[in-house]
Amino acid sequence: MTKKVYVKTFGCQMNEYDSDKMVDVLNAAEGLEKTDTPEDADIILFNTCSVREKAQEKVFSDLGRVRELKEAKPGLLIGVGGCVASQEGASIVSRAPYVDLVFGPQTLHRLPQMIDARRASGRAQVDITFPEIEKFDHLPPARVEGPSAFVSIMEGCSKYCSYCVVPYTRGDEVSRPLDDVLTEVAGLADQGVREVTLLGQNVNAYRGALAAGSSEIADFATLIEYVADIPGIERIRYTTSHPKEFTQRLIDTYAKVPKLVNHLHLPVQHGSDRILMAMKRGYTVLEYKSVIRKLRAIRPDLSLSTDMIVGFPGETEDDFDKMMALVHEMGYDTSFSFIYSPRPGTPAANLADDTPRDVKLKRLQHLQATIEENVARISQSMVGKVERILVEGPSRKDPNELAGRTENNRVVNFPAPLASHPRLIGQMIDVKINHAYPHSLRGELVIVSDDASAATH
């Protein structure tokens, strides 16, 4: 009987990528298959996030729920990976003695050896070391589950923003060699992937050797140009970028590489220079706006999303007003916005914070309501237009329909003959947008590629 692994992922797309790799590693080493049901699993893994306190505490809450499964199934192994594991280490086992494995983002490739050691010794195994970029040398080829895929191009962060734990949980920035990344992307393209998202905590800080051991370095713009030349790749996305690393070379890439989508996620975090300085972000609002101005000179319709923190220590009403002014000026399509959550061990955790919680909550609600207005306005402006989408699979709303994504990352549901579904999935097609809804669009097929056209008849 095939053994199964269940992985629950918290946090960012880097963690989603790492979770897929955990499954790949265990499949290659032990033949385990992924399950979406923890009750069916022989191994349960939590890939954790420590960016906010709420996410961290939810891990321990979920661990408590699977404890009963372990009591009913003694051979079940429970593991905690990711940033909480890196930050807490062996204290996780002290708090939850039924946990068998604790591993960091850089040691997930050692899972088979840790499992063997746990079974042989009967003791919990903890490995939260930072062996640079070693894990990529030990990962099996990716198993593709659709026409889109994530590719991690670097690990860690060296920015040390005053509020952030990532440099402490993932280590400093280390880039994969260029040829390693290109080999992975080419392998994905051979399996039918048409869109890749290049991942890194500060992805545009990429500085990868041309090959292992080479002294020549490729920057992020060079990497994008090479990825665009790989046969089969039709779209390139990346996340998360940092304003401080947005070079003119990267800006020029938006003119040179049409496959680079017309959407950018560029976290600003705040709209007040005073708060940005306290956050140690390393740029001013004017410098941030300058990057966007240059990009929109090349791509006038570039859509923009961001991250924002409300209620950072010392934030005044004037600071918040400046944030809202920036939101209106930039016209953000989406914002991942949260109330500041102090993280132990970060400089900002020691700052005086005298803003009442209810004030922070009102500010957050105002910010999110404004962003939602932007989202609705942009979605409505797309009605009547023809959009190029990548068909990802059956619609969640109606399995008799198909769904795909626009360049600005909106889901479009559209009807198509059932017999055409297998051939349409993975194709780039054109749809006319007929309706805009709060979280999706609806359209109709108007133009397809030759292959897809044949599939509809």
From Swiss-Prot:
UniProt cofactor note: Binds 2 [4Fe-4S] clusters. One cluster is coordinated with 3 cysteines and an exchangeable S-adenosyl-L-methionine.
Domain annotation Radical SAM core: ranges: 143-377
Domain MTTase N-terminal: 3-120
Domain of life: Bacteria
Residues spanning the membrane: none
Catalytic class of the enzyme: transferase
E.C. designation(s): 2.8.4.3
UniProt entry keywords in alphabetical sequence: 4Fe-4S, Cytoplasm, Iron, Iron-sulfur, Metal-binding, S-adenosyl-L-methionine, Transferase, tRNA processing
Annotated GO MF terms: 4 iron, 4 sulfur cluster binding; metal ion binding; N6-isopentenyladenosine methylthiotransferase activity
PROSITE patterns from the UniProt entry: MTTASE_N, MTTASE_RADICAL, RADICAL_SAM, TRAM
Function: Catalyzes the methylthiolation of N6-(dimethylallyl)adenosine (i(6)A), leading to the formation of 2-methylthio-N6-(dimethylallyl)adenosine (ms(2)i(6)A) at position 37 in tRNAs that read codons beginning with uridine.
NCBIfam families per UniProt: miaB-methiolase, MiaB/RimO family radical SAM methylthiotransferase
Full protein name: tRNA-2-methylthio-N(6)-dimethylallyladenosine synthase
Organism: Burkholderia cenocepacia (strain ATCC BAA-245 / DSM 16553 / LMG 16656 / NCTC 13227 / J2315 / CF5610) (Burkholderia cepacia (strain J2315))
